UniProtKB/Swiss-Prot annotation:
Coiled-coil regions, chain positions: none
Entry keywords, A to Z: ATP-binding, Cytoplasm, Glycolysis, Kinase, Nucleotide-binding, Transferase
Organism field: Frankia alni (strain DSM 45986 / CECT 9034 / ACN14a)
Record's subcellular location: Cytoplasm
Binding site for substrate: D19, L20, N21, R38, H61, L62, G63, R64, R124, R161
Xref: Gene3D superfamilies: Phosphoglycerate kinase, N-terminal domain
Protein name in the entry: Phosphoglycerate kinase
Family membership noted in the UniProt record: Belongs to the phosphoglycerate kinase family.
EC number: 2.7.2.3
Gene Ontology cellular component terms for the protein in this record: cytosol
Length: 400
């Protein structure tokens, strides 16, 4: 896989596929970025290219617009923040239409000098970006490729998507992997190939079905698999416990039974949970044993004894991978489990990886220093699919 060090970019136009898919608060007059982690992660690649005299064209998606312009998902606020982080202006090439690589974008790109940068509008404003139709996708990829002379793939959070800007444009231009993609790959290789032991994996989130592939891939390799979040209730049901009104995938109970039989005492489940009479910040709550959830009660967090149990199993771990919150951390009464587990991971001396998505958001929301972890990934789904051993279209396109 080539790197940007292998490209002679001075004076040339370079299309960089970054992942600037950040959360925006639109409650005020001006949209505000609430977590700029992905923007910050994109800077090393863009800055390195600019320092070498490249004319950089940054591309990204934001949210899930339906293949047409939607001002709620414009990248214009991101252009401003990217410029602040780079210490130089970022020309925004959006014109309010879905013609992402059209006449206006070509005009902005033509005006770039060496060491200057532009940001195109949200790629998903064009139906060609995510189309299942190869001809439609190819047409959009052709338009993007026509803007540049080189391509750099740096959107690790999107490499599992067979989208035009990720998997098709690299087939049309000399290409290389960006700094972020290379860093993410190095981290994931440390997690999957001969990790330092003891090796602990913490999985949370809503559904067992979403994490089944990574559970099956990692279970033979780990010394402890700690299960929290909504998915733990299907495991508890597999033990024969009632789970009240908690999230339950009934069709996954037999699968969980088989996993528990395979994993034995390496699979660690909560011993107590925080329950509520309804899904709300002001709900009535209680801490109950994991086998004592009453009818009509919802499990929304692991309990204090479980948090201590998980922290104990994390103590002394040489490698830790965490993906998925322990509870509904966005609501204060149900944040303690996620906070406690995050702090336990942060306090360790081993190699610790936060697996992107909601876990990364939890670290920032709960005010835990990011530098307390060895790495905070920008790719939730991409990380999981890599660890499952799947072929990721965006990586395959760069590796040729």
């Amino acid at each position: 896989m080539r790197t940007i060090d292998d490209l002679q970019v001075a004076g040339h136009r370079v299309l960089v596929r970054s992942d600037l898919n950040v959360p925006l608060d639109r409650s005020g007059d001006t949209p505000r970025i609430t977590d700029d982690g992905r923007v910050r992660a994109s800077v090393p690649t863009i800055a390195a290219l600019l320092d070498r005299g490249a004319r950089v064209i940054v591309t990204s998606h934001l949210g899930r617009p339906k293949g047409e312009p939607d001002p709620r998902y414009s990248l214009e606020p991101v252009a401003a923040r990217l410029g602040e982080l780079l210490g130089r202006p970022v020309a925004f090439a959006g014109d309010g239409t879905g013609d992402i690589a059209g006449a206006h974008a070509r005009e902005v790109v033509a005006g770039l000098g060496d060491g200057e940068v532009a940001l195109l509008e949200n790629l998903r404003f064009s139906p060609g970006e995510t189309s299942k139709d190869a001809v439609t996708r190819a047409s959009f990829a052709d338009a993007l490729a026509a803007l540049a002379e080189f391509y750099v793939g740096d959107a690790f959070g999107a490499v599992h998507r067979a989208h035009a800007s990720v998997a098709d444009v690299p087939k049309r231009l000399p290409h290389a992997a960006g700094r972020l993609v290379l860093t993410e790959l190095d981290v994931l290789r440390r997690l999957s190939a001969d990790p330092a032991r003891p090796y602990a994996v913490v999985l949370g989130g809503s559904k067992v079905s979403d994490k089944l592939g990574v559970i099956r891939a990692l279970l033979p390799k780990v010394d402890a698999l700690l299960v929290g979040g909504g998915m733990c209730f299907t495991f508890l049901a597999a033990l024969g416990h009632g789970v009240g009104g908690s999230l339950l995938e009934a069709e996954m109970i037999d699968t969980c039974k088989a996993l528990l039989a395979e994993g034995g005492d390496r699979i660690v489940l909560p011993t107590d949970v925080v329950v509520a009479d309804r899904f709300a910040a002001d709900a009535q709550t209680a801490v109950v044993p994991a086998d004592g959830i009453g009818d009509g009660w919802l499990g929304l967090d692991i309990g204090p004894a479980s948090t201590a149990l998980f922290a104990g199993r994390l103590d002394g771990a040489a490698t830790v991978f965490w993906n998925g919150p322990m509870g509904v951390f966005e609501l204060a009464p149900f944040a303690a489990g996620t906070r406690g587990v995050a702090k336990a991971i942060a306090a360790g001396d081993g190699f610790s990886v936060v697996g992107g998505g909601d876990s990364a958001a939890a670290v920032r929301t709960l005010g835990i220093p990011e530098d307390a972890f060895s790495h905070i990934s920008t790719g939730g789904g991409a990380s999981l699919e890599y660890l499952e051993g799947k072929t990721l279209p965006g990586l395959a396109a760069l590796d040729v």
